[in-house]
Amino acid sequence: MNSRKKSREVALQVLFQKIFSEDSTAEELFSAFQGSFDLDPKTSERAHTLTSSVLKHENEIFAILESKSKNWRVDRMATIDLIILKLAIFELCFDKDDDTPPKMCISDYVDVAKKYSSADSKKFINGILDEVWKSSEK
């Protein structure tokens, strides 16, 4: 698995754990998780950046998600799908340091959904991220 994909999966797992450890900071959770993964420094730094940036921009990301999830209430989405979408929306709309092409970013997160979520999630996530990408190009 390449560094970019691994950092996304680590960030996903840390953000998922954050839901159940509300009193813990992202840094505390990331430090606890870091020992569970064999991460090189670049991957570790990227995963930490993704985690903290999604939390920092959570309100803006949520607003974008709500506007692009037609016929879907965000509060009814599966938790893991919601986290995958938040990570991807951060990368598509806010991450100016990453030069990953948008289509590749979307494809990578659809692959994450295939691995961590239900069979139907990949289509749902792909559809929302495609809408986000199209609107961010304008």
What are these regions (language model features)?
Residues 1-122, 126-138:
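N-terminal interaction/assembly modules
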